[in-house]
Regions:
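Cyclic nucleotide-binding regulatory domains
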Residues: 38-100
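Phosphate-/nucleic-acid-contacting segments
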Residues: 162-228
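Cyclic-nucleotide recognition modules
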Residues: 22, 73-131, 135
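Polybasic "coupling" helices that flank or enter modular domains
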Residues: 99, 117-187
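Single conserved hydrophobic/aromatic residue that forms the stacking wall/gate
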Residues: 1-5, 9, 13
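Regulatory nucleotide-sensing modules
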Residues: 14-55
């Protein structure tokens, strides 16, 4: 469970463990490979594992009314997910799937719980992560319910930029999303997402080539996102 950036170091549990705990994790850690769009876990299943994304991209989503899907959160490398339901003693209330071919590690939550009971530093790590996620969820609810379509799509593009960054050209988002996924992230129909993207292209805020999106005017996108 190595990390490279400052944020990744903050998210890594390794630094909060003693040598015996590290050995227990190494012995129990299992690596899984997921294909593009493959389900990792489904809403209603019982939570058994702590999931850690090692490589690739993962989305957490929930099926809504009329077959609509809402993407709740994007997972990036060296980020843990899927543990809230276990702590709440309830089934998963959302699903997770791979955006692209991804490598994910698992630890039994029974092991994690045992270590938390004996290690306050590890307990505080999960308290911190749950608190951050709750704050992010509150912000997302406000954004999705109060912003207009342009503001919601601009917000989605900024989230993708902040989560995954750019390719080497410093313009192309390092994630290639279907229009449907972009719409599900922005709480709008696919047709509205396509029209709004076209509007951003006309305003020279972005360029679009298939699923490749290049951000040409990030300050203006952030302004649109901020003021909705």
């Amino acid at each position: 469970l190595h990390s490279t950036s400052r944020r990744q170091r903050q998210m890594c549990i390794r630094d909060r463990l003693d040598n015996d705990e590290k050995r227990r994790i190494i012995d129990a850690f299992v690596i899984h490979n997921f294909k593009k769009n493959q389900m990792i876990y489904a809403e209603g299943e019982e939570p058994e594992y702590l999931w850690c994304l090692l490589q690739g991209k993962v989305k957490k989503f929930k099926d809504g009314v009329g077959g609509r899907v809402q993407i709740l959160r994007l997972i990036r490398s060296v980020q843990y997910f899927g543990y809230r339901a276990y702590f709440a003693k309830e089934p998963y209330n959302s699903s997770a799937a791979a955006f692209e071919p991804s490598i994910v590690g698992t630890l039994p939550m029974t092991l994690v719980e045992d270590m938390i009971n004996k290690n306050p530093k590890l307990a505080w790590f999960f308290i911190h992560e749950l608190s951050r996620n709750l704050g992010g969820s509150d912000t997302k609810i406000v954004n999705l319910t109060q912003k207009h379509i342009r503001g919601r799509l601009a917000e989605a593009l900024i989230v993708l930029r902040d989560h995954y960054g750019f390719e080497d050209d410093n313009m192309t988002l390092r994630i290639y999303m279907a229009r449907e996924d972009l719409a599900n992230l922005s709480n709008m129909t696919t047709s509205n997402a396509i029209r709004t993207l076209s509007g951003f292209v006309s305003e020279r805020l972005i360029t679009v080539d298939g699923r490749r999106i290049c951000i040409l005017n990030e300050p203006m996108l952030r302004k649109i996102s901020k003021f909705g």
